[in-house]
Regions:
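A structural "flexibility-hinge" signal
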Residues: 1-214
Length: 214
């Protein structure tokens, strides 16, 4: 499954190999191979959900604003400091949570009220269980946004919501086309009323939660 990852999900998956996977595994108390497999499902799920959100009116602008507000430091230099960011994310109670590292808050913006559904589905599909899958998503969410900030804010004034929306839209399409865990979960998570259709009511809920006020 992980070998089929492409685009931004594949690029970020490669950056997380080695020490980051080991650190997250130690935090979760899981086998590194299982953690790696779960990351391979979680990244396209997160990026795909962001891609669907950015297709809503003003969605890309809202996400770009959140990146500029909370994650702009990741756009400086030669790339975001993955080791430092992961250390902050895994620091737990020893460090004050900031908007940049607030994984639970970010998930709430990405998935709205369906964040528990995303965690439960990922946990069931990967064998992590809902609690550990939720923890993994909270670890990955700040990393995903910092990765996006490094990619799309690096040009300073050239930051373009249309380019961000297009790139994330491609991630959403790839996740759906590839099927697998992420593709199946995207449908369940985005169909918030459980009727099998992504309707206006579902989109209104998502739009209302998308990177609004903290």
């Amino acid at each position: 499954m992980n070998e089929s990852l492409s685009g931004m999900a594949g690029a970020l998956f490669q950056q997380l190999q080695g020490a980051p996977v080991q650190q997250m595994s130690a935090q979760l108390g899981t086998d590194p191979q299982q953690t790696q497999s779960a990351i391979g499902a979680a990244l396209p799920l997160l990026l795909g959900a962001l891609g669907r959100n950015t297709q809503q009116p003003n969605g890309a602008e809202a996400l770009l604003g959140a990146l500029q507000r909370d994650h702009a430091s990741s756009a400086s230099g030669n790339g975001f400091d993955l080791g430092g960011l992961l250390g902050s994310v895994l620091g737990g109670g020893s460090q004050a949570t900031t908007p940049q590292t607030d994984g639970a808050g970010i998930l709430g913006h990405v998935f709205g009220n369906s964040a528990p559904t995303a965690a439960a589905g990922l946990g069931q599909a990967t064998g992590l269980g809902g609690d550990k899958a939720g923890q993994l998503l909270q670890m990955l969410a700040p990393i995903v946004l910092s990765f996006l900030a490094q990619r799309f804010l690096g040009g300073g004034d050239n930051a373009n919501p249309a380019q961000l929306g297009q790139a994330l839209g491609q991630e959403h399409a790839q996740a759906q086309q590839s099927g697998g865990i992420a593709g199946g979960l995207l449908g369940k998570v985005l169909d918030q009323d459980g009727d099998g259709d992504l309707d206006v009511g579902d989109l209104m809920k998502l739009g209302g939660s998308l990177f609004g006020k903290h």
